UniProtKB/Swiss-Prot annotation:
Species in which this protein is naturally found: Pongo abelii (Sumatran orangutan)
Cystine residue pairs: none
SMART domains: RRM (SM00360)
Family indicated by similarity: Belongs to the CELF/BRUNOL family.
Protein name in the entry: CUGBP Elav-like family member 1
Quaternary structure and interacting proteins, as annotated: Associates with polysomes. Interacts with HNRNPH1; the interaction in RNA-dependent. Interacts with PARN. Component of an EIF2 complex at least composed of CELF1/CUGBP1, CALR, CALR3, EIF2S1, EIF2S2, HSP90B1 and HSPA5.
Molecular-function annotations in GO: RNA binding
Keyword tags: Activator, Cytoplasm, Isopeptide bond, mRNA processing, mRNA splicing, Nucleus, Phosphoprotein, Repeat, RNA-binding, Ubl conjugation
């Protein structure tokens, strides 16, 4: 027995020595370090908001609380002698898990001594090409009898699988779909090419679907599209998008949501998101700017009580839109909801040649209800907000306006106003300069009709060349409409020029303008 012990102990000592001499060494905290290289899926992290006085040793002590650290590289300003820390670094853990745990514990959570802001920790730019969302696949139309192991076996031939998960319903049963994450995007792409619609599994009505899983941005777009679709269905049930009075339910939140979805879709080029929203078909990226003006104007009108009161007493041409079939004379007795008016313009955008002039017509609901007392008791703030909202509109399409108004009304005004030089009361006559060369009397009338009843619109023509002098006069039947037109149209850009709109001077002055 003793001989056995003597023979055995040296072997134990040799084994113990060999363990200590192996590449695996002990860390300061007592846990075993990793040999040589980090794991294949390890992440290089960028860390900001660290003290400039901290060295690699200080940073290592901070990060090793979350796992073994392979490498730390402090970024330094080489123009100084000696080079000084820039207050940021790169850190690579041996495992992906340790890096994510450190990020969860430190990012925007911990403020280091001497710093005013919390640590910023995120994957380095070089890691973005290997983001999880670029390697994760959605597998649909799989048998509900499949287990995670079955899915792993099915896809393991395409590369190393980092994660495999069956999606379960609230009833505890499989939803017939799964998520599979590979270690590289190339592996995921190979799996898509080989497996998408390659087979129809038991209990499934169509072939297997294999595609990249939706990113958070994709999910957000789908959610917004669903909300918009529900809004449109509700409105459609009440008015079939034909009776504009049914648009009373539209608020600025809806318009802002509409704008946000369009902006994201236009920037991403993913027009499929809007395929189910048929009333939106007439809008394009050039009209997003105008829709933003509508949303801002709607919000301003709703948030200004005095402005809303003025809007509800409107007798402007826009009231014709909300009372289908009514005559101009009867339209003044109809109450116009400001949000419905703006919503009506947004709805008609798809039917117009351009939304720019149409969006200006939204002003009319305000202008018609503003009297001199209205301008002095605070409703002018709403007018200012609306003017600012429309200040960004850069394009102009005169052909759009006739589609927004009752054609009979337009014809009646055209007969009496276009080309005539009849003047309105004092303060209701405008001088317009920098008109496009091709603009005629009818174009001038159409451009200024949204702000009130135009009694005359005249573009001056050079008698020798028979060409426009690029200026003209517009007269309203009241000074309030003239002021509204000045606020909205002065500085309005058409092509390469900006309109100059001001009050026509009195006959007693030496110059008419």
């Amino acid at each position: 027995m003793a001989a056995f012990k003597l023979d055995f102990l040296p072997e134990m000592m040799v084994d113990h020595c060999s363990l200590n001499s192996s590449p695996v060494s002990k860390k300061m905290n007592g846990t075993l370090d990793h040999p040589d290289q980090p794991d294949l899926d390890a992440i290089k992290m960028f860390v900001g908001q660290v003290p400039r006085t901290w060295s690699e040793k200080d940073l290592r002590e901070l990060f090793e609380q979350y796992g073994a650290v392979y490498e730390i590289n402090v970024l330094r300003d080489r123009s100084q002698n000696p080079p000084q820390s820039k207050g940021c670094c790169f850190v690579t853990f041996y495992t992906r898990k340790a890096a994510l745990e450190a990020q969860n514990a430190l990012h925007n959570m911990k403020v280091l001594p001497g710093m005013h802001h919390p640590i910023q920790m995120k994957p380095a730019d070089s890691e973005k090409n290997n983001a999880v969302e670029d390697r994760k696949l959605f597998i649909g139309m799989i048998s509900k009898k499949c287990t995670e192991n079955d899915i792993r076996v099915m896809f393991s031939s395409f590369g190393q699988i980092e994660e495999c998960r069956i999606l379960w319903g609230p009833d505890g049963l499989s939803r017939g779909c799964a998520l599979v994450t590979f270690t590289t995007r190339a592996m995921a792409q190979t799996a898509i090419k080989a497996m998408h619609q390659a087979q129809t599994m038991e209990g499934c009505s169509s072939p297997m679907v294999v595609k990249f899983a939706d990113t958070q941005k994709d999910k957000e777009q789908k959610r917004m599209a669903q909300q918009l679709q529900q809004q449109m269905q509700q409105i459609s049930a009440a008015s079939v998008w034909g009776n504009l009075a049914g648009l009373n339910t539209l608020g600025p939140q809806y318009l802002a949501l509409y704008l946000q979805l369009l902006q994201q879709t236009a920037s991403s080029g993913n027009l499929n998101t809007l395929s189910s929203l048929h009333p939106m078909g007439g809008l394009n990226a050039m009209q997003l700017q105008n829709l933003a003006a509508l949303a801002a104007a709607a919000s301003a009108a709703q948030n200004t009580p005095s402005g809303t009161n003025a809007l509800t007493t409107s007798s402007s041409p826009l009231s014709v839109l909300t009372s289908s079939g009514s005559s101009p004379s009867s339209s003044s007795s109809n109450s116009v909801n400001p949000i419905a008016s703006l919503g009506a313009l947004q709805t008609l955008a798809g039917a117009t040649a351009g939304l720019n002039v149409g969006s200006l017509a939204g002003m009319a609901a305000l202008n018609g209800g503003l009297g001199s007392s209205g301008l002095s008791n605070g409703t002018g703030s709403t007018m200012e907000a609306l003017t600012q909202a429309y200040s960004g509109i850069q394009q102009y399409a005169a052909a759009a306006l006739p589609t927004l108004y009752n054609q009979n009304l337009l014809t009646q005004q055209s007969i009496g106003a276009a080309g005539s030089q009849k003047e309105g009361p004092e303060g209701a006559n405008l001088f317009i300069y920098h008109l496009p060369q091709e603009f005629g009397d009818q174009d001038l009338l159409q451009m200024f009709m949204p702000f009130g009843n135009v009694v005359s619109a005249k573009v001056f023509i050079d008698k020798q060349t028979n060409l426009s002098k690029c200026f003209g006069f517009v007269s309203y039947d009241n000074p309030v409409s003239a002021q509204a037109a000045i606020q909205s149209m002065n500085g309005f850009q058409i092509g390469m020029k900006r309109l100059k709109v001001q009050l026509k001077r009195s006959k007693n002055d030496s110059k008419p303008y």
